[in-house]
Amino acid sequence: MPKLITAAERLILAREFIQKARDYPLPIDGGKYDFSYIAQVKDLLRQARDMVKYLPHSAGAGTIIKSDALRILQEADLADKEILH
């Protein structure tokens, strides 16, 4: 049975995924338009979103957790625009 991840751990992991996407090295050939690079960055940002996407709707999460989750979702969207556009 998989280990349950608490809401606080999910927030931390989501931030780490966003940071990994920002730090992902640009390939020499093709730069930021390389399909492999785009796929890896989008996958990391998707993992970050998946970590927190249900927290704002969770009854057991406090208001601070919910607001942090919404902030992370916005940060993932912003990182997508900054990195790939």
Residue ranges, per PLM feature:
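Long, charged/polar, soluble alpha-helical segments
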Residues: 1-85
